Amino acid sequence: MNRRTFLATTVIGSLATGIGSAAAAAERYFPLKVDPALFESINRVKIPGKKSPLEMSHAPLITAPKSVKAGELFTVEVSVGERVHDMGPAHWIEYIELAIGNEPLGRIEFQPRGFMKPKATFSVVLPKDVAPSGVVTLVALQRCNLHGLWESTLDISVG
């Protein structure tokens, strides 16, 4: 074996070992598998009375008064899941959005380090013209890095 072949073999072997080690480390750091089907559309709870564990930890939970007065301030809280979703570098909630129907109200973005819990509080005032029928639908969206986009709705009456 000449020197050139020896050096080339050594370099290629070292690179292969380094890449293999990096891939193994990434698999240990990000061990969760992603279900691509969860990213094809908006996910919603299928049977409200019988939520799956995935639905219980990913469907946004909207907490708001059942009835509000037009022009008066009220609070809407959106948390991710009945059991609040864990936050960490391998699995986290990217954002929470709140809308009235198709009208966006606000968005809170999260980072994956886990400093914050996926909960957002919105202060809302609804003018009378927003609810000609006397009812509005609050729509909460959240996106999980591994389980896609989830949506929940809540109807409230506006007097």
Q: Model-flagged regions — what are they?
A:
Residues M1-S14:
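N-terminal secretory signal peptides and thylakoid transit peptides that target proteins
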Residues G20-I62:
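C-terminal segment of N-terminal export signals and the immediately downstream linker at the start
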Residues E72-V76:
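Structural beta-strand segments of beta-rich domains
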Residues P118-P127, T153:
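Exposed aromatic-hydrophobic patches
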